[in-house]
Amino acid sequence: MRVVAGRLKGRVLKTPESRAIRPTSERLRESIFDILAHRHANAVEGARVVDLFAGSGALAIEALSRGAGFALLVDNGSEARALLRANIEALGLGGLTRIWRADATKLGRAPAGGPFSLAFLDPPYGEGLAGPALASLVAGDWLRPGALVVVEEAAKAEIAAPPALKPIDARVYGDAQIAIFAMSGAG
């Protein structure tokens, strides 16, 4: 698996040995970032990114490659955090990232450096975690007004977002769906 575009284009990302972590495919990442660049006034440039269920870090690393200013990568799994550390170290992104161990559905208050302008959520498919994680982001004031939130979930899954997140785009790519929300002015 490789970084699709930007200053790290073509660099190889380490992938998980187990099937417990499902990285976002190169094709799907390219589609996500094309949407963000062309339909949402290049929401990536200079963004402060939070990546929930970060896994390999593919989404946050792609954002950093394309000009994001900082990424907080959140995952509760020890295998995922080891993979995140390996990818960040191999790509020299230590100064632009922080890895945080947390349950994405029970985040609490936003850490120093928040609120964030761009969020990625790629929970395990079919486990109903997207809705609680979105609610946790909103309840903890993790998102600035106008922040974009990109959710990858199974194509047929329902994504229950809190009222503060307004749906602005949704697309299906094979077995996956991408839903994009914008944070309203009040959290």
Can you say where each PLM-predicted feature lies in the sequence?
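Class I S-adenosyl-L-methionine-dependent methyltransferase catalytic core
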Residues: M1-G187
